[in-house]
């Protein structure tokens, strides 16, 4: 009886192992294939060059400095350095801030229904507290891009991002 149970169990385990091994051998997922194709394109090559350049490394170093605060959604002290984004930017409304000695783009996106009125009252050298869930980068910008989720000034909340409807 034990031999029969052992033989049946073994006959079920071996085909499963072969199926899983075959899935791993098949290779890359479509996402990996698409990424490799993009990396081989002119845009992908330019992006890789930017990542390896001094400007790209500076942006990544700036992201690394605030990564813990982003992950924990904790307060970051900032000073407003400019009320306008760099020339030619397409991030919607935003300002330039200095956090711990590094400059960042603080982006809010496209305005709807006067939601940025309190932000427009900010002045250069105002001290604010930022909470954010996201920091990103792009070769077009020489600074990391922080998405402003909550902005406080003098302990008063002046902006809170409204989450999008439908999930994300």
Put a short name on every predicted segment.
Residues 1-4:
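Positively charged n-region of N-terminal signal peptides that target proteins for export
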Residues 6, 19-72, 166-168:
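OB/S1-fold single-stranded nucleic-acid-binding modules
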Residues 7-15:
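Bacterial N-terminal signal peptides
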Residues 71-91:
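Structural detector for short beta-strands of small beta-barrel domains
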Residues 79-83, 106-118:
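N-terminal post-signal-peptidase region of extra-cytosolic proteins
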Residues 89-109:
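OB-fold (S1/OB) nucleic-acid-binding surfaces
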Residues 113-130:
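Short nucleic-acid-contacting surface segments enriched for D/E, G, S/T with interspersed K/R
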Residues 135-167:
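OB-fold/S1-family single-stranded nucleic acid-binding modules
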């Amino acid at each position: 009886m034990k031999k029969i149970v052992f033989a049946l169990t073994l006959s079920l385990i071996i085909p499963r192992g072969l199926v899983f091994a075959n899935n791993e051998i098949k290779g890359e997922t479509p996402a990996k294939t698409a990424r490799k194709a993009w990396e081989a394109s002119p845009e992908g090559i330019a992006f890789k060059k930017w990542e390896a350049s001094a400007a790209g490394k500076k942006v990544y170093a700036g992201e690394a400095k605030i990564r813990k605060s982003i992950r924990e959604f904790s307060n970051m002290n900032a000073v407003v350095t400019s009320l306008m984004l760099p020339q030619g930017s397409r991030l919607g409304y935003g300002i330039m801030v200095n956090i711990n000695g590094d400059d960042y783009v603080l982006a809010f996106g496209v305005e709807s229904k006067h939601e940025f009125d309190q932000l427009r009252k900010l002045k250069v050298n105002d001290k604010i507290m930022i909470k954010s869930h996201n920091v990103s980068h792009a070769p077009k910008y020489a600074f990391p891009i922080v998405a402003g989720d909550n902005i406080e000034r003098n302990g008063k909340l002046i902006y809170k991002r409204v989450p999008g409807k439908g999930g994300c």
